[in-house]
């Protein structure tokens, strides 16, 4: 297959994955973000990169957004929101993050393929995501892509869609958000 044909197939998979995401769950996440004093994002590996990109856009919107594990991350306070992206919902470090957030009376939102996972069971809000686990032999969702690629890509697109929803709710545009962009580059 040609590279451009692979691109087309990946885009087709991403297009189809949108139908598996609940607008109601997405709206609940947006509402939690709007009502939270601080928002923390977490993920491991490529899912962690997606979490960082989401925190960055939230910061561009003026939200008090942080990335779990960074050296400048402040303490979580009661009622703060922790958004965890984990395909399997069984990543050990993220299970610990969810448990710690709950012990501090934070609100945990889990974006996962597996709502019945250890992280899902601790979550106050679950956003069910399409995709295949890294070990695709146990997955019911078929993809041509390796390991968790479809989940990770869908996660990024979902985060960007939530940003658009928040922009709409707050009446923001890209130009306004750019005033929060780094300027020491």
Swiss-Prot record:
Per the UniProt entry, the Enzyme Commission number(s) are 5.3.1.27
Q: Where does this protein act, in terms of pathway?
A: One-carbon metabolism; formaldehyde assimilation via RuMP pathway; D-fructose 6-phosphate from D-ribulose 5-phosphate and formaldehyde: step 2/2
- PROSITE patterns associated with the record: SIS
> CDD domains from the entry?
SIS_PHI
For the biological process aspect of GO, one term held by this record is:
response to toxic substance
Gene3D superfamilies annotated for this entry?
A: Glucose-6-phosphate isomerase like protein, domain 1
Q: What up-regulates or down-regulates this gene?
A: By formaldehyde, under the control of HxlR. Not induced by methanol, formate, or methylamine.
What reaction gets catalysed by this protein?
D-arabino-hex-3-ulose 6-phosphate = beta-D-fructose 6-phosphate
Q: Where is the SIS domain?
A: 29-172
Positions contributing to substrate binding: 47, 86-91
The record's annotation in InterPro entries points to: PHI/rmpB, SIS_dom, SIS_dom_sf
Q: Which GO terms describe its molecular function?
A: 6-phospho-3-hexuloisomerase activity; carbohydrate derivative binding
Residue intervals passing through the bilayer: none
Record-annotated active site: 152 (proton acceptor)
List keywords of the entry alphabetically: Carbohydrate metabolism, Detoxification, Isomerase
Highest taxon above the source species: Bacteria
Provide the assembly information: Homotetramer.
Its job: Catalyzes the isomerization between 3-hexulose 6-phosphate and fructose 6-phosphate. Together with HxlA, may act as a formaldehyde detoxification system.
The family classification in the record reads: Belongs to the SIS family. PHI subfamily.
What is the name of this protein?
Answer: 3-hexulose-6-phosphate isomerase
According to its UniProt entry, this protein's organism is Bacillus subtilis (strain 168)
- The gene behind this protein is hxlB
């Amino acid at each position: 297959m040609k590279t451009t044909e692979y691109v087309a197939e990946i885009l087709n998979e991403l297009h189809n994955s949108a139908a598996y995401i609940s607008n109601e769950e997405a709206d609940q996440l947006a509402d939690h973000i709007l009502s939270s004093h601080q928002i923390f994002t977490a993920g491991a590996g490529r899912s962690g990169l997606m979490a960082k990109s989401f925190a960055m856009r939230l910061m561009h919107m003026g939200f008090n957004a942080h990335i779990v594990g960074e050296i400048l991350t402040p303490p979580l306070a009661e009622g703060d929101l922790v958004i965890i992206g984990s395909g399997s919902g069984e990543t050990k470090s993220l299970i610990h993050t969810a448990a710690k957030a709950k012990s501090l009376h934070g609100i945990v939102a889990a974006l996962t393929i597996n709502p019945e996972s250890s992280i899902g069971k601790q979550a106050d809000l679950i956003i069910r995501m399409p995709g295949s686990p890294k070990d695709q032999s146990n997955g019911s969702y078929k993809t041509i892509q390796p390991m968790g690629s479809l989940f990770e890509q869908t996660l990024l697109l979902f985060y960007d869609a939530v940003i658009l929803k928040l922009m709409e709710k707050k009446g923001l545009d890209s130009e306004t958000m750019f005033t929060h962009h780094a300027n020491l580059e």
